[in-house]
Amino acid sequence: SAAPVSAFTLWKKEKVVLTKGAEFLGRFKGGEISDRRYCTKCGGHISVDHPTLGLIDVRIGALRDFPFKPKVHLNYAETILPMRDGLPKLKDFPAAIGGSGETLPE
């Protein structure tokens, strides 16, 4: 996305099930580390599969009735829009999924 911030959730791939609209799911494989899914009707971003991490990120707008409360900022080393919200800011990803786990100051 071209937005300076995007809201997504990270899940283990086996926990994600598409319940409706599979016929409109397009795919763009950007490389070995990401496999993007989008809606072929509207172009909306649905998810990104991260095979090397064993995770899939699903955009909040693709989830219905999901009580979203942000918990962390990821890839904050690349931010162009500093956020002063009290949430932890990780340089990249948590160490548990292959990132540095390094936090950055607000």
Question: What is the role of each PLM region?
Answer:
Residues 1-106:
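A short Gly-Trp-Pro
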